[in-house]
A protein has these predicted regions:
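Charged, compositionally biased N-terminal leader segments and the immediate start
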Residues: 1-29
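N-proximal short alpha-helices
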Residues: 10-14, 49, 115
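Short, contiguous, helix-prone interaction/anchoring segments in small proteins
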Residues: 32-43
């Protein structure tokens, strides 16, 4: 089979913070991103990590069923959660526990879900979140049209 070129171009790297945590002066800090908001978001990440560690401990001692850890996803979930509007819907994957809590799903519902109880997927009215989808990649199809 003859060879053919399938890509020509360049890939750019965007770095907002340098290695010392300083913001690039050309880019600057996004409007509305205050120190207070950053601290609030950081506290959310810490809470998600503590929640996750507790859930993992429960799972490893046989007190919780299958559980997919969110470790390493905290910042992405907080960033997305804070960027979403109140009317936006979340179609979570199996590692989106933090994002679900930001959207109004109580932590005990998430634990109930991972213990195999369908009541863990019943959320209060006004919580725009579908139940967790475990199959990888199915969220896009489920979210289409919401």
């Amino acid at each position: 089979m003859p060879r053919k070129v399938v890509f020509e171009g360049q890939i750019e790297h965007l770095q907002i913070l340098d290695e010392n945590g300083k913001v690039d002066p050309e880019i600057g800090v996004p409007e509305g991103l205050t120190n207070e908001l950053l601290v609030e978001m950081y506290k959310e990440m810490l809470f998600f990590r503590r929640f996750d560690k507790k859930a993992l401990a429960l799972q490893r001692t046989g007190q919780l069923g299958t559980y997919a850890s969110l470790i390493g996803q905290e910042a992405a979930q907080v960033g997305l959660g804070y960027a979403m509007n109140e009317k936006d819907w979340l179609v979570p994957s199996f590692r989106d526990q933090g994002l679900m809590m930001l959207r109004g799903v109580p932590g005990h519902k998430i634990i109930t879900y991972w213990n195999g109880d369908e009541r863990g997927s019943q959320y209060d009215e006004g919580v725009n979140c579908l139940p967790i989808c475990v199959p990888v990649g199915s969220q896009l199809l489920h979210g289409a049209g919401l």
